[in-house]
Curated annotation (Swiss-Prot):
The lineage of its organism: Bacteria, Bacillati, Cyanobacteriota, Cyanophyceae, Synechococcales. GO terms for biological process: selenocysteine biosynthetic process; seryl-tRNA aminoacylation. One of its GO terms (cellular component) is cytoplasm. It catalyses: tRNA(Ser) + L-serine + ATP = L-seryl-tRNA(Ser) + AMP + diphosphate + H(+); tRNA(Sec) + L-serine + ATP = L-seryl-tRNA(Sec) + AMP + diphosphate + H(+). L-serine binds at residues 233-235, 287, 385. It is found in: Cytoplasm. It is an enzyme of class 6 (ligase). This is Serine--tRNA ligase. One of its GO terms (molecular function) is serine-tRNA ligase activity. InterPro entries: aa-tRNA-synt_IIb (IPR002314), aa-tRNA-synth_II (IPR006195), aa-tRNA-synth_II/BPL/LPL (IPR045864), Ser-tRNA-ligase_type_1 (IPR002317), Ser-tRNA-synth_1_N (IPR015866), SerRS_1_N_sf (IPR042103), SerRS_core (IPR033729), tRNA-bd_arm (IPR010978). Belongs to the class-II aminoacyl-tRNA synthetase family. Type-1 seryl-tRNA synthetase subfamily. Catalyzes the attachment of serine to tRNA(Ser). Is also able to aminoacylate tRNA(Sec) with serine, to form the misacylated tRNA L-seryl-tRNA(Sec), which will be further converted into selenocysteinyl-tRNA(Sec). Homodimer. The tRNA molecule binds across the dimer. Consists of two distinct domains, a catalytic core and a N-terminal extension that is involved in tRNA binding.
Length: 425
């Protein structure tokens, strides 16, 4: 959430920065609410000061021997009571305005970083670097064809169980998924991340704090009777792990590696990626999440991206790093690097991780602060997939496919899977 004082006092700056995202917005109404709230604060503060003065004068007169029931003292007390009533009315009006202001601020996305490249959409994103040599060939299969030959997952039966865009992993497929999750968690925890397995059902406050609500309500599955939602990413519960807390600066950074199933309705994606593991309603993911001191967030962004890249390198999967332009940024992000893995069968790069710096945007929504010698201020948060497990499996299948129908696995994964390849049953 944006700083309401910044929106109130610098509306042109906010409008210009949101314009970099391609958003044209009239902030007049929001600015008016913020100014009304400020006026009420000033009136309340003035009345409270007058009330304190009257209370002090009453005390002094009594100390000097005045009868507490004397008319002059009683008149002062009556004035004090009237002021208290006026203050109560102003406080109620402030609360109402504050709720309206927060509702509008929650709908505004984060401001892009000054370092973020300008652009309108994904066509203006900029490639930063590549790793590995992409495998190419005319006869290479896409991952769902390989999975069908190896009987790695059930699609039609999953429709019977749930609906389309669900899969049931079977046999070697289920084993490979489990191996990948354990491998990713072990790799990250060996670098100092603390492992987390959070709830997959989260409340509205958690989704609001991370930035999914109110904008992305249609993208999420909701248990309406219980005010609970299926989490679209572990970023949501991990953000709220420290909601309404003050974290001492000496404890920072806090670095978490969280595994969770993720659930997304994929509204608006009809007809896209209807086969295989690329776009599902339910998928597994290992999420990296940092709480950092505001002075250290830029360096942390480089490191969290490198930690996500390390998974792809260990699995010998060629990829490229793309920096998103201002017009393609996610709602809560101020700067993002996407990792795109090469899929030889598809002959294309596909996103497998987004590593984002959110600044104090999520921290303000979730009231997460830190305290150092300079005082108490909002913390900075960062997140990145480390990695999306299903898409990693798809890349492994297409990269390691052999002419005999087997799939050769990278050496780093062999101890977790128990074999160096997937073989036809």
């Amino acid at each position: 959430m944006l700083d309401q004082r910044l929106v109130r006092d610098n509306p042109d700056l906010i409008a210009n920065e949101l314009g970099r995202r391609g958003i044209t917005l009239d902030l007049t109404g929001l600015q008016l609410i913020a100014q009304q709230q400020r006026n009420l604060e000033e009136q309340r503060s003035s009345l409270q000061a007058e009330g304190n003065r009257i209370g002090k004068e009453v005390g002094q007169r009594i100390q000097q021997g005045s009868d507490p029931k004397a008319s002059d003292v009683a008149e002062l007390r009556q004035q004090g009571n009237l002021i208290k009533q006026k203050v109560a009315v102003l406080e109620d009006e402030e609360k109402q305005l504050s709720a309206r202001l927060r509702e509008q601020l929650l709908s505004l996305p984060n401001l892009p970083s000054p370092d973020c490249p300008e652009g309108r959409d994904e066509n203006d994103n900029q490639e930063r670097h590549r790793w590995g040599k992409p495998r190419e060939g005319k006869d290479l299969l896409e991952h769902w064809s390989i999975a069908e030959r190896l009987k790695l997952f059930e699609t039609e039966r999953s429709v019977r169980i749930a609906q389309s865009r669900f899969v049931t992993l079977m046999g070697q497929g289920a084993r490979l998924e489990r191996a990948l999750i354990n491998f990713m968690l072990d790799l990250h925890t060996s670098k100092g991340y603390r492992e987390v397995m959070p709830p997959v059902l989260v409340n509205t406050a958690s989704l609001t704090g991370s930035g999914q609500l109110p904008k992305f309500a249609e993208e999420s599955f909701r248990c309406a009777e219980d005010d609970l939602w299926l989490t679209p990413t572990a970023e949501v519960p991990v953000t709220s792990l420290h909601r309404d807390e003050i974290i001492p600066a000496e404890q920072l950074p806090l670095r978490y590696a969280a595994y969770s199933p993720c659930f997304r309705r994929e509204a608006g994606s009809y007809g896209r990626d209807t086969r295989g593991l690329i776009r599902l309603h339910q998928f597994n993911k290992v999420e990296l999440y940092w709480f950092v001191h505001p002075d250290h967030s830029q360096a942390a962004h480089a490191q969290i991206t490198a930690d996500a890249e390390a998974v792809l390198q260990a699995l010998e999967l060629p990829y490229r790093v793309i920096e998103l332009c201002t017009g393609d940024l996610g709602f809560s992000s101020s700067r993002t690097y996407d990792l795109e893995v090469w899929l030889p069968g598809a002959g294309a790069f596909r996103e497998i991780s987004s590593c984002s710096i959110c600044g104090d945007f999520q921290a303000r929504r979730s009231a997460i602060r830190t305290k150092d010698e300079k005082g108490t201020r909002l913390i900075h948060t960062l997140n990145g997939s480390g990695l999306a497990v299903g898409r990693t499996m798809a890349a492994l299948l297409e990269t390691g496919q052999q002419s005999d129908g087997s799939v050769l696995l990278p050496k780093a994964l062999v101890p977790y899977f128990g074999n160096d390849r997937l073989e036809p049953e």
